Amino acid sequence: MKKLITLILAAALTLAACASAPDTASTPLANSTPEPTAATTPAPTTAPFYPVANSYNNGDTYYAFVHRGEDSLLLKTDYAAATQTVNCAVPGCAHDSDACPAYFTDGPGRNLVITDDPLRVCHVEDSGCPVQIYTVDPAEGKAMQEINGVGNCDIAYCDGTALYGIDKTVLPSEATPACRIDLASGQLDRFTMLPSELMLGCYDDGLLTVHYVTDAPLPKNGEEYAAAVQSATLEFDCWDPRTGTRTKLAERLYNSTDARFSGYDGTANDKLYFVDYLPQNDGTDIKLSLTVVDPAMGTEEKMWDTWPDEHFGLSIGQRILPVHGDQSTRWLGMCYSNSGTNREIPYFMDLETGEIKEVTQKREGLSYDRRVTVLAQANDGRWLIETAADEQRSCLGMALITPEQLLAGSTDWQEITMWQG
């Protein structure tokens, strides 16, 4: 049983929380199934992909934004020095205008940290708005490149030289438009994926995708589509948009409860995890079995027949690991979350021993019970954790601690000297 619980938590924990989609003009499709096209601009094929977010962890440094009303500052946490500073080395800078390398307006949209050498920030807004890419020099300032014509681009992945995304607004019967933005030149390339194909996350040196497999092209008409898709299967692939290389990883039957993902719940250590659901009359679903698919071994195994509690779900996945390097993990997390009781309790499982342990240390500064949370993992294996926050969930305290110490209930961590702004 303990082994089963371990695998379950593993499954639950590593959700590749990423999926994205850029929009740009796509080629009109015929009724036949079109072949996907690779991005036309040459790109390195050895660099792995990683999801982009408003924070960035390279194993030595953690970059994240702090919001200050209508603007944000990019902060840098150095693990070796255990200090957090503004990412600005301009003498006498007040960090209150665009002249500051760390200053970014909030406005609409999101600021994403996308590379660290050189340091780049991408600002994305609603569909139709230009994408802005900033190259940041802490001592000199920042240079901005504006990319027009991206359309409904939802940027979500990077390989260090280019950004990638897809347009999820098109019908599943149509080929999925995708785009690539070269970070050096700013060149925008458009290409297509298979009809209904979506990006789910990263896998090996490619992207994890899913698409419907049907005997005939899916119709566009709503009722005809709903009838035709019932007999579809969902194929999960590792796909490299730079070369067009595609490797099938898993196949699942269509499931009306989770029509686009057929219960896909995450990826951990190159294994795919799927949850089966049982629909209820009140419109809710009950979690049933947990299945793990190991593409390398060609095996599919049911690891769990009944979930221990409906309130358990995914928590921390691959995003805590350094962007570059080995993406395997010993520690997998799960969270008990019950909005009815306002309870949120993180757990971690040691895959080597099968032990499941609760994180008991509480975050300071909150009027309600919230435990410390893991933000990132350093190259030396320690975890960067948030130890204090305000009622708006702004981070007020951080520390470094080994996983073993944290899960033993210790508060003997190395505190980060926080920037006082």
Name these PLM-found stretches.
Residues 2-10:
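Sec-dependent signal peptide recognition
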Residues 15-17:
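C-terminal motif of bacterial Sec signal peptides marking the signal peptidase cleavage site
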Residues 19-22:
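Bacterial signal peptide processing site
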Residues 27-85, 89:
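An edge-strand/N-cap motif at the start of beta-rich repeat modules
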Residues 42-48, 72-98, 128-149, 171-193, ...:
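Surface-exposed loop/turn elements that mediate protein-protein interactions on large endomembrane-trafficking
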Residues 48-58, 95-114, 150-160, 193-205, ...:
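Repeated scaffold domains used in trafficking and secretory/extracellular systems
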Residues 53-72, 105-126, 156, 161-171, ...:
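Short beta-strand elements that form the blades of beta-propeller/WD-repeat-like
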